[in-house]
Amino acid sequence: GGGFGGKFAAYLDPVAAILSKKTGHPVKMVMNRTEAFESTGPTPGSYVKVKMGATNEGKLTAAQAYLAYEAGAFPGSPVGAGAMTVFAVYDIPNVVIDGLDITVNKPKTDAYRAPGATNAAYGTETVVDELAERLGIEPLEFRLMNAAKEGTRRADGPVYPRIGCVEVLEAMR
């Protein structure tokens, strides 16, 4: 169970804040189910292309991603989250990521669970499986060989503290 995060933009919060300020009292606003569905939009369509290279021994050396996410009629797709997560769990020295926020003649898109991340992760993990198979390395071992760990620099700059990626993969053995 659980809501797993909000599914729509917060339209009520600013209205409640203004009403509370004007009245001097707390204000609670609740949408019914119909209003909640009408205030959101569809999840964004996406096109994800991932290329990865590794040595014959299985060490990832380079990766490239092209991410195009539909935003609907106005900019605002979750392509930024996709770009941050596409190679986040791997230690790859050479990375290029192109992310496009595409406006199209459709309703605005909105967030659902892990907006932007799942699309990118699926592209990466599919390629990782294919690469491991081509190299004759068991996929879990391939992931362990290349897992991000403390000190790994993510493609968009931050250096990881201890994140537990290796420990999770080892527990899966």
Regions found by a protein language model. Give the residues of each.
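Structural alpha/beta core scaffold segments of enzyme domains
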Residues: 1-173
